[in-house]
Design a protein with these regions (language model features):
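Glycine-rich NAD(P)-binding loop of Rossmann-like domains
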Residues: 1-22
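C-terminal helix-to-coil terminal segments
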Residues: 2, 87, 134-195
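Hydrophobic "lid"/C-terminal helical patch
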Residues: 23, 64, 120, 171, ...
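Aromatic pocket-lining residues of Rossmann-like dinucleotide-binding sites
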Residues: 26-27
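Short beta-strand "acidic-cap" motif of Rossmann-like dinucleotide-binding folds
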Residues: 34-36, 129
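Rossmann-like adenosine-cofactor binding region
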Residues: 41-143
């Protein structure tokens, strides 16, 4: 049985915040080509991280055999990863033998799970791993859980002692900053402060 190497393979990161940039650093160390789609990201930040910033999400899917999702769930991102986009992935074309792979540890609902199952069955996607689902908890009878090329975990990606300690420390720091009358660095919806 032969596998394929990650070195030289294109990794597409949907969203390019702190976590995605950390994933990019590890993937780059393994020799992967780093691509991202983030409509809010300045090109300068992508360049500083050695990533190619795609202006259109379809371009990311056309280029990358590996997709990792790192964006928030919103009306804009609901079912962002769907049958149409998974069919664009290049892993079955032009003699590329590595296949196509999707990972979502961000939020359930970004991946259309019915479309993902169909893509796994028709070969557009070779393997997928989700830590988050549109309806949680996902059960053992969930159709994706029954597919041999699917790996699912019950939203436990951050369930380590160290991660939980960091979360507690980050929350305490944000509360203290707010009590000092300042805006916490980790605030994600600053636009609502003025309302």
């Amino acid at each position: 049985m032969n596998g394929t190497e990650l070195s030289g393979k294109p990794l597409g990161l949907i969203g390019f915040g702190r976590i995605a940039q950390g994933v990019a650093a590890v993937a780059k160390a393994m020799g992967m080509q780093i691509h991202t789609y983030d409509p809010y990201l300045p090109v300068k930040i992508a360049r500083q991280q050695g990533a190619f910033l795609h202006k259109k999400i379809d371009s990311l899917f056309e280029t990358c055999t590996h997709i990792s999702i790192h964006c928030n769930l919103s009306d804009e991102t609901h079912h962002l990863v769907n049958a149409k986009r998974m069919a664009l992935m290049p892993g079955k074309a032009n003699g590329i033998a590595c296949g196509n792979h999707i990972v979502n540890c961000a939020r359930g609902g970004i991946v259309n799970e019915d479309d993902l199952l169909e893509a796994l069955e028709n070969g557009n996607v070779t393997s997928a791993a989700l830590d988050v689902f549109e309806i949680e908890p996902a059960t053992n009878g969930h159709p994706l859980m029954l597919h041999p090329n699917f790996h699912g975990t019950p939203h436990i990606g951050a369930a380590t002692l160290e991660a939980q300690q960091r979360v507690g420390t980050d929350i305490a720091a944000a509360v203290m900053t707010t009590l000092d009358g300042k805006v916490a660095e980790t605030l994600v919806n600053k636009e609502f402060l003025s309302s």
